[in-house]
Regions:
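Helix-to-loop junction immediately C-terminal to a conserved catalytic motif
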Residues: 50
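Conserved ABC transporter NBD signature motif
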Residues: 58-69
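ABC ATPase NBD coupling module
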Residues: 67-83, 120
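Conserved ABC ATPase "signature" region
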Residues: 114-139
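Conserved ABC ATPase signature
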Residues: 143-147, 151
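Catalytic Walker B motif of ABC-type/P-loop ATPase nucleotide-binding domains
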Residues: 168-171
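Helix N-cap at the start of a conserved alpha-helix in ABC-type nucleotide-binding domains
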Residues: 179-181
């Protein structure tokens, strides 16, 4: 279980609040969508959970251990097991989808593999299996500059899974995608949660959150204003955003 306790973050000399005492518990295999207006703290919360940003108060507890009190090794373990997918995935556009998946992210892959691109045969087969699971087997040998935005998002997801991600934090993964591509990405996420017990926390438009997520967090002005099971929101809940 993952516990977020009183997570609070301010910015600037005037200490403008970005996150206001966020409290939540997350269970394995949940597909959580964060919704809210622009500037409500959605991306900031994701980046804090990924340890890409710090916070002033509160704690992130994973498996009973406070991450910030677990030292360098604890933080590195989390960064290996948690993947942060930005809106525009950092892929090498001159390499194939398969190579991007195999080489992985810095911090997860030995330096010699990052430089040479050399891989073991079992790694190759594992990557091909994941690409097949995500509907990308026919794109494995295509360079990433030839792929659509939705396909690139799935390549980034495959890369995270091949390198051991148990939690995926995805910042607006369907922004700019056509409806069919967006649905394909989110169906992939939902399948990973239900079949592989991967935990996914992502920022989504409200209508997509209602369709695909198993749980919805509503943020407004840095405050968690509701935490509900995935369904259509009531008008009263929408009014909180």
């Amino acid at each position: 279980m993952i516990k977020i306790r009183k997570l609070t973050k301010h910015v600037g000399p005037e200490r403008i609040p970005l996150l206001r005492g966020i409290d939540a518990e997350i269970h394995q295999g949940e597909f959580i969508a964060i919704v809210g207006p622009s500037g409500s703290g959605k991306t900031t919360l994701l980046r804090c959970l990924a340890l890409h940003e710090s916070w002033e108060e509160g704690s992130l507890i994973v498996g009973g251990n406070d991450v910030l009190k677990s030292g360098w090794t604890g933080k590195m373990k989390l960064k290996r097991e948690w993947a942060y997918l930005e809106q525009n995935p950092h892929l090498n556009m001159n390499r194939t989808a398969l190579k991007n998946v195999l080489i992985g992210r810095s911090g997860q892959t030995p330096w010699w593999r990052m430089v040479t691109g050399m891989v073991r045969s079992d790694d190759y087969m594992g990557a091909m299996d994941v690409l097949e699971d995500l509907g990308l087997l026919d794109k494995a040998h295509d360079k990433c500059d030839k792929l659509s935005g939705g396909e690139r998002q799935r390549v980034a997801t495959a890369r995270a899974l091949v390198h051991g991600a148990k939690v995926i934090l995805a910042d607006e993964p369907v922004n700019g995608l056509d409806p069919a591509s967006a649905s394909h990405v989110l169906e992939t996420f939902r399948k990973l949660c239900s079949d592989e017990r991967v935990t996914i926390i992502t920022v989504l438009p409200l209508e997509m959150a209602e369709r695909f997520a198993s749980r919805i967090w509503g943020l407004n002005e840095g405050e968690l204003v509701f935490d509900i099971q995935g369904r259509r929101l009531t008008q009263a809940e929408k009014n909180k955003l």
